[in-house]
């Protein structure tokens, strides 16, 4: 499900970058690509290995293939984390809604779904309503909503989003508790999503749990 959604994101990004207009998306991606270019210096062999592990294609120029895929990957990660955070908040009785995901799934039109994602998730409306002001700040990863102005892209994107929402709806978020030895679920998810070689090229290194516990003890 996640790979299928990232493929839709990748298709939308390639289309937006290849067509006239779309200045906002091009600007956001340009900023991202510049930052990525400053951080990553990969060999051809490393690029092949990373591309093979991502699991989706990019139909745009080969020169921006890897930064585009990383942009897509982080967009997916950003949206998923916001949705999970909203469900945790709702599941613990902190919101008037019992599930934002179910509310999104109940929306009948693609246009309504896009608008709800924009206002409640990407603009932080859901979180602001429960007092979590400033929880959502990185507007750079909301670009996918602006890419849905074209009907064909909107239709396929919304189908992929609904599939993702349906998959998330089967999980129980009220069982997530903070315990001293609980694993960092979001950290583990991110490490599984972004290939290790790519994370290291960006200067991202994580201390193993056993070493942290040993150091603290």
Predicted regions and their residues:
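Charged, often flexible domain-edge or linker segments that flank or initiate folded functional domains
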Residues: 1-151, 205-208, 212-217
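Class I S-adenosyl-L-methionine
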Residues: 137-216
């Amino acid at each position: 499900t996640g790979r299928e959604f990232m493929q839709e994101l990748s298709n939308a990004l390639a289309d937006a970058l290849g067509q006239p207009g779309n200045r906002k998306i091009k600007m956001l991606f340009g900023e991202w690509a510049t930052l990525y270019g400053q951080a990553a210096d990969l060999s051809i062999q490393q690029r092949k290995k990373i591309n093979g592990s991502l699991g989706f294609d990019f139909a745009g120029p080969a020169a921006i293939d890897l930064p585009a895929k990383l942009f897509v990957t982080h967009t997916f990660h950003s949206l998923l984390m916001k949705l999970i955070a909203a469900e945790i908040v709702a599941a613990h009785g902190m919101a008037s809604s019992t599930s934002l995901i179910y509310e999104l799934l109940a929306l009948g039109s693609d246009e309504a779904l896009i608008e709800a994602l924009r206002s409640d998730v990407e603009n932080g409306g859901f979180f602001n309503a429960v007092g979590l002001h400033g929880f959502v700040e990185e507007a750079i990863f909301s670009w996918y909503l602006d890419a849905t102005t074209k009907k064909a892209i909107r239709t396929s994107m919304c189908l992929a989003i609904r599939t993702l929402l349906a998959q998330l709806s089967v999980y129980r978020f009220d069982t997530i508790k903070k315990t001293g030895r609980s694993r960092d679920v979001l950290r583990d998810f991110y490490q599984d999503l972004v290939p290790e070689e790519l994370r290291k090229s960006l200067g991202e290194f994580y201390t193993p749990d056993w070493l942290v516990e040993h150091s603290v003890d």
